[in-house]
Amino acid sequence: MNISFFLKPKVEVKYLQDDCSVQQALADMLESGFTAVPVIDKTGRYIGTIGEGDFLRLLMRTPAEKAAAMPVGQVRRRVTHRTVSMDASMEGLVELVTDQNFVPVVDGRGMFCGIITRHDVIKYMTGIWKAKT
């Protein structure tokens, strides 16, 4: 099944602009309860996903005041989250969600469209398995 039915669109997703400060990003993540969020540039292009571990590694090697003011887009990310396009299938996401809480969805120009959550992939696959039994 095509992922468009399960897409959580950009307007409903917590994401960060790449020029957002680390201090603001951490405050936003703490408030939202998310441990990782997509990062996009000013044009809406997906840059990557940043997580709590990325911030912790930054704080371990950078003075706190300098780290707090650093733009999120300059923080080194340990993991590169793989993206999919709108024509991807839910079945094709199973492998991706074993390592990612969500899968970023981008268009042909790399513009961020939204996400598919691990929960939705599991729910979809469980429904298929139940239908077969």
Which residues fall in each region the model found?
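Bateman (tandem CBS) regulatory domains
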Residues: M1-V13, A68-T80
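The conserved cystathionine-beta-synthase
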Residues: Y15-G33, I40, R82-Q100, V106-G108, ...
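Regulatory sensory and allosteric helical modules in signal-transduction proteins
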Residues: R61, R77, R82-V84
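Short, flexible segments with low predicted structural confidence
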Residues: M1, L26-A27, Y46-G48, A64-A69, ...
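A glycine-centered beta-loop-beta connector
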Residues: M29-S32, V37-D54, V97, V105-D120
